Structures are given as structure tokens and as C-alpha cells.
Swiss-Prot record:
Interacts (via N-terminal 120 amino acid region) with ETV5 (via C-terminal). This is Zinc finger MYM-type protein 5. Functions as a transcriptional regulator. Residues 190-218 are annotated as: Disordered. SMART domains: TRASH, ZnF_TTF. InterPro entries: TRASH_dom, Znf_MYM, ZnF_MYMT-QRICH1, Znf_TTF. GO terms for biological process: negative regulation of transcription by RNA polymerase II. Keywords: Isopeptide bond, Metal-binding, Nucleus, Repeat, Transcription, Transcription regulation, Ubl conjugation, Zinc, Zinc-finger. Pfam families: zf-FCS (PF06467). Its main location: nucleus. GO terms for molecular function: zinc ion binding. There is a cross-link at residues 92, 167, 226, 456, 463, 552 (Glycyl lysine isopeptide (Lys-Gly) (interchain with G-Cter in SUMO2)). Residues 190-212 have a biased composition (Polar residues).
Length: 673
């Protein structure tokens, strides 16, 4: 096709090569003819006439219209995108216009004649279902010297993003901006300029015919400013939080002992606050559900949308299935542990860690028993639980059963004494009730046995004639230990009297045969101790052998009195009152395990322990064992019970002495027929 005048626009065969091929449809709108032509004809090309090629892709319709050129001017800025005009590979374009694209050198020489008017109206309507995008841009037209400045509005419409990417000989879609004057053509398309912010939508552009402040007209459009987010934790300074007791709300001081229940976040200042404060969960109904029927967890995915987060958020449902509820209930049951003192499988309230060994205690009573057995000193008042910062702070000290108890003031001491007296009175009253019940039962048995006497005497005819009347006088004291008979009773009556003596405890026991008093040497003690012997040893506390010339063994080692003392981690020294040395067997024994121990133990067996080389390690390991701690608790408990029983017996003896003055002698007279 021949060349036309410079004022017209010819579409030649080289146009697809210069502008690109097979990606976007454009409608070229003629601005006007500077040589007198009134308007350019409208050229329409059908979509169906252009459907040819190797891949069979569809091309869009191209419209060429005429519009009035704008009068305003602006710096030259063009779009950096790769716009490709659709064209069929086998058909030629028809028309009387040709697009002349000059080189960069020619544009630089004709800079004064180039129109400075450009309108950047880059509006993208992106749909989520992947439909077409429409991008409208306005480009300038470069004319020859002496001609008027022209503006060509190019309307580009892309079929889809996937179609433009599948075309060959076409660069990737780049929505950035570049200067047309500095652009180059390579293989029918613009030079590719990759920008790190090229994916950001440029819909928020500046108004028409207005220069962006602070940005050069020949530089790419500045990317949107990035927002800097700071966490609220960094913006606000951290404040030191006060730790308070969950029950009494008193602040905990530095160095104060705090108590915490297992599985709870609450802290307490004393065991009193810990026991009084209770948060028990409401019991849940247990649903028996098969694991196969348990619903599976579902995850909800939040799509990204317009958020700047790089990955979608995933979160699972918070509701658990009935099967999982039952599993959690089973775990809570399994969380129960066995108490070190009472051996009950229950919830644990106290945990004491001694030399990396944790001892679990279920109640305050067990904790106090453990503390008394191991000589633990508390830094708080025994009555109110007030914190005592130093040893000198607790001036009021009360010694009970060999243990020192600290109090914050004299009022707490008086309250504690009153509480002990009240408990002692309750114990005495219960013991009196038990003894009175036993005495009444013995009296009923005595009445019943006397009523049987007439029946027994009828069986003996010889005695009937001789004996007309039997008189039985019985003198009863508080313990009902003496029964006097004024007449000779038949053998059946004597048998009843023997039974009565057995019930009243007058029959000698087997324990009286075994000597109750034992030597202080544990090597001479029998293997099995009687109850009386054990009680005697607990009451009297066997002494430790001191100031003795301990013999040496074959290796030249011997026992030393330094083993009687234990040095704690904080430097304090405590006495091992349970360690006894046997002079007869030249070995050591554990008093607690010897009296209450079960099973095999070096410090419990008949020969004891005489490994002087490793004795220090053996003793430290033994006193931390669970068996030794349990036996020590049993020892201290029995000792306190024996003291209490002695007090009760002494009080009863005083009562008997008072009532003995007004004693009543009962005479029972039986008439035998």
C-alpha cells in the first residue's frame, strides 16, 4: 500500500510489527486533519473477521473515531505498560492512515514541537471472577516540524489477563509508568521496566493536568507511602505490677514465701489463705459418645481480599465434641496424686521440693505433720499467716511438742492457746463418752449374768436343799474392776465370773510376759516389737551414743559423731535424732524405720549399716526417701497421741479421785428358788 499525506493516519503492514500483536484491542480516534480534511472516516472491523491464527484466539473490535483535541498542556508522561494491538496474522489491515513512530533521537530533537498535554486517567475495574479489564489512556501524537500539536486518545481494552499472557512475542503485563521520550521498541513492544511496586494498584492517581508535587515529570510515578505500624506494647511503657494475695489482697513483699495451688495462677501469702480460697469448677455432665461419631474439627479460611497480609488466616472452631469433653474429664481424674503423708489419692494442695524431690500433700494437716517431722521453719505467723521478714521479727515464740512456733503478736499466741485448749476439751469429752458407754455395757452384761443364776442352780438338786437363798454383794467402782461374792457359787457361776474378769481386763495379757523395758542399744532389740515396747521407745526417745571410742574397721574407717548433724543448703545445722549407733554390732540404725518400717532397708535390718566409706551419701539419700518421711510422720503422730492420752488419763484420774469420796457400794441380792 502506498504512502499518504502526513496529515493522515495510515495502517500499513508494518503496524502490527511496530506496535505489537495479539494482546489488546484499541480504537484510534483521529483528532483532526491539519490540511483541511473535516473528519476521518470511521473504520470498523468485525471481531469475526479477525479470528485467525495458529492458536485460534479471538481479537476485539477496533474503532477509529474523531474527537476534539484538548487545549491544555502538561509534561510528557506515558504509560509503561506493554500495549499490544490485535491483528490477524494472515489478513492485512485496511485503511488510509499509517502510524509513524519516530525514534528517540528524533523525539529529542523535536522536543520543542512536541505537545506537552497528557492526561493520566488510569482507572482499573478489577472483578473477582476474572472478567475483562478496561484501561483508558491518552497519548500524544508526534508531528512533523511546522505542523500543529495533536493528541491521540487511545482506548485500549484487554480481553483478559490470561489471554495477554499466553500470546507469544509479548512481554509480561507491567502496569508501571515510563517516559515515552526515553522508551525504546524491541520486537514490536516497549522496553520492559520491572518495578518492585509494579503490583500495587495505581487507581489512586493525581488529577488531570496537575503535576505531582515533589516528583519530576520524567521520573516514574512515586509509589504509595507505606504505613508504619507499631504495636501498642512498644508505644506504652511497661508498669511494674504488684503481686497480691488472692484471698486477703495483701501485697507480697520481696523474699516472702508464696503458696500456689497446682494448676492455678493464684498466689497466697499463707496456707490459711490457700485453704480458705477455693475455686472449684462446676461438674460437667459426662456424655458417652463413640469416637467414630465424634465430629471432626473444621478450619475456616479467611480470604486475603484487599488486606496487605501475605497469607490467609486460619482458625479452628472453639467448640469441642462430647468425646473430647469426656477425654478432658478423664485427664482431670488422672491428675490426682497420692499424698505423701496419708497416702490418699486426691487433689494435691501443697508441694514441697527438697533436694530435687517433690513431696505432695493433700491438706493443711498433712502439711503441718510433714513440717513438724522434718523441722521446717515457716516465716509466717502460725495463727494469722502474717509474713515475718526475719527471725528477730517474731518475738513471740511458743514451744509445743519440741517444735518452736512463731507468732506476730501476743494476741495470736493467746488465740492459738485457746484453740488448743478447746480441741483438748473436745477430745476429753469424746473419751469420757466412750468410757461411759463401755461401763454401761459392762453393767448390762453383769445384770444379765446374774439373772441366769437361778436357771443354773435348778440343774443341781443337791444344792437346792442346802441353799435356800444366795446373796451376792458387788462393789462397783468407776472402772468396775472389783466383784465380791459373799457366798460360794456353783461351778457355772464361777465360769461366768471368769468371763466377766476377762471382759473387765483383769486377765493377764500376753504383753506382760514380754519385757516392756528395752536397752538403748538398737542392736539388741527383737526383730518384731510389741505395741508396748514400741510405745515405750517412742515416749522415752532412745539416746545417741556420744563420747565413745568408736572402733575402726579393716580399712581404718570408723563412725563419727559428725554424722549426727546435717548441714542444709542454706548453711543451717539440724540434728539427726533418728540416727542411733549400736555398740554391740558397731553399726547405725534409723529409729523411725526400725519401729514403723516395712521391707528391706540397710538402716532397718538386724545388722544395720556399717559402710563408713559411703555413709554420708547413704544417710542423705535415706532421709529424702518417701519411706523415711512416712515413718517419721507416724513416729511424731504416735508421740503426740501418747502425750494426749496421758493428759486425758491424768484428768480422768483426778475426776475419779473427786468422785471416789462419794462412791456408792451396790449390793445385789438374789433369791434362789
Amino acid at each position: 500500500m502506498g504512502e499518504c499525506s502526513a496529515g493522515r493516519l495510515d495502517l500499513t503492514e508494518q503496524t502490527p510489527i511496530l506496535l505489537g500483536s495479539k494482546a489488546m484491542a484499541a480504537s484510534l480516534m483521529d483528532v483532526g486533519d491539519s490540511f483541511g480534511d473535516p473528519a476521518s472516516p470511521l473504520v470498523n472491523r468485525s471481531r469475526n473477521s479477525l479470528v485467525e491464527g495458529d492458536n485460534g484466539d479471538d481479537d476485539d473490535v477496533v474503532f477509529i473515531e474523531s474527537i476534539q483535541p484538548p487545549s491544555s498542556s502538561a509534561p510528557v508522561i506515558a504509560d509503561q505498560r506493554h500495549f499490544v494491538f490485535p491483528a490477524s496474522r494472515n489478513k492485512k489491515l485496511q485503511g488510509h492512515y499509517s502510524v509513524i513512530l519516530p525514534s528517540s533521537r528524533y523525539l529529542a530533537s523535536q522536543k520543542g514541537n512536541t505537545s506537552e498535554t497528557i492526561v493520566i486517567d488510569d482507572e482499573e475495574d478489577m472483578e473477582t471472577n476474572g472478567r475483562e479489564k478496561t484501561v483508558s489512556s491518552s497519548f500524544i501524537e508526534w508531528g512533523f516540524p511546522g505542523t500543529k500539536n495533536r493528541t491521540k486518545d487511545l482506548d485500549f481494552s484487554t480481553s483478559s489477563l490470561s489471554r495477554s499472557k499466553t500470546k507469544t512475542a509479548v512481554g509480561p503485563f507491567n502496569p508501571g509508568r515510563m517516559n515515552v521520550a526515553g522508551g525504546e521498541f524491541q520486537n514490536g513492544g516497549f522496553t520492559t521496566h520491572h518495578s518492585p511496586d509494579s503490583w500495587i494498584s495505581q487507581s489512586a492517581s493525581f488529577p488531570r493536568n496537575q503535576k505531582q508535587p515533589g516528583v519530576d515529570s520524567l521520573s516514574p510515578v512515586a509509589s504509595l507511602p507505606k504505613q508504619i505500624f507499631q504495636s501498642s506494647a512498644q508505644q506504652q511503657p511497661t508498669k511494674a505490677a504488684k503481686i497480691t494475695c488472692a484471698n486477703c489482697k495483701k501485697p507480697l513483699q520481696k523474699g516472702q514465701t508464696a503458696y500456689q495451688r497446682k494448676g492455678s495462677a493464684h498466689l497466697f501469702c499463707s496456707t490459711t489463705c490457700l485453704s480458705s480460697f477455693s475455686h472449684k469448677r462446676t461438674p460437667k455432665k459426662r456424655n458417652v459418645t463413640c469416637k467414630k461419631d465424634a465430629p471432626t474439627k473444621k478450619a475456616t479460611v479467611v480470604p486475603q481480599g484487599e488486606s496487605s497480609e501475605p497469607f490467609p488466616k486460619c482458625f479452628s472452631t472453639s467448640h469441642l465434641s462430647p468425646y473430647e469433653d469426656s477425654q478432658n474429664l478423664r485427664k482431670r481424674v488422672l491428675n490426682k496424686s497420692r499424698c505423701t503423708i496419708c497416702n490418699k489419692l486426691t487433689e494435691i494442695r501443697h508441694e514441697v521440693s527438697v533436694n530435687n524431690v517433690t513431696h505432695k500433700l493433700c491438706s493443711n494437716q498433712c502439711f503441718n505433720k510433714y513440717r513438724l517431722a522434718n523441722g521446717l521453719v515457716m516465716n509466717c505467723c502460725e495463727q494469722c499467716g502474717e509474713y515475718l521478714p526475719g527471725k528477730g521479727a517474731g518475738n513471740n515464740v511458743l514451744v509445743i511438742e519440741g517444735q518452736q512456733m512463731r507468732f506476730c503478736c501476743q494476741s495470736c499466741v493467746n488465740e492459738y492457746k485457746q484453740m488448743i485448749e478447746t480441741n483438748l476439751k473436745k477430745i476429753l469429752a469424746s473419751e469420757n463418752r466412750k468410757r461411759n458407754a463401755v461401763g454401761e455395757e459392762n453393767e448390762r452384761e453383769l445384770y444379765g449374768s446374774l439373772n441366769i443364776l437361778p436357771e443354773k442352780t435348778e440343774e443341781i438338786p443337791e444344792k437346792k436343799e442346802k441353799t435356800s437363798e444366795l446373796q451376792v454383794s458387788a462393789e462397783c467402782s468407776l472402772d468396775a474392776s472389783v466383784v465380791q461374792q459373799n457366798v460360794n457359787l456353783p461351778p457355772s457361776v464361777s465360769d461366768i465370773a471368769d468371763k466377766l474378769q476377762e471382759q473387765l481386763g483383769e486377765k493377764p495379757s500376753e504383753d506382760s510376759i514380754i519385757p516392756a523395758v528395752l536397752s538403748a542399744d538398737p542392736g539388741t532389740w527383737p526383730r518384731i516389737l510389741s505395741i508396748k515396747q514400741r510405745d515405750t521407745l517412742v515416749e522415752n526417745d532412745p539416746p545417741q551414743v556420744r563420747n565413745f571410742n568408736f572402733p575402726k574397721d579393716s580399712t581404718g574407717r570408723k563412725f563419727s559423731e559428725t554424722y549426727y548433724t546435717r548441714i542444709l543448703a542454706n548453711g543451717e545445722k539440724t540434728t539427726r535424732s533418728w540416727l542411733l549407733y549400736s555398740t554391740s554390732k558397731d553399726s547405725v540404725f534409723c529409729l523411725y524405720c526400725k519401729l514403723f518400717g516395712e521391707g528391706k532397708n540397710q538402716l532397718k535390718n538386724e545388722n544395720g549399716c556399717r559402710d563408713w566409706q559411703h555413709l554420708s551419701h547413704i544417710l542423705s539419700k535415706h532421709e529424702e526417701s518417701e519411706m523415711h518421711i512416712n515413718n517419721s510422720v507416724k513416729y511424731s503422730k504416735l508421740k503426740s497421741d501418747l502425750k494426749t492420752s496421758k493428759i486425758v488419763e491424768a484428768s480422768e484420774h483426778r475426776l475419779q479421785e473427786r468422785e471416789g469420796k462419794d462412791g456408792v457400794k451396790l449390793l445385789y441380792t438374789l433369791d434362789l428358788i
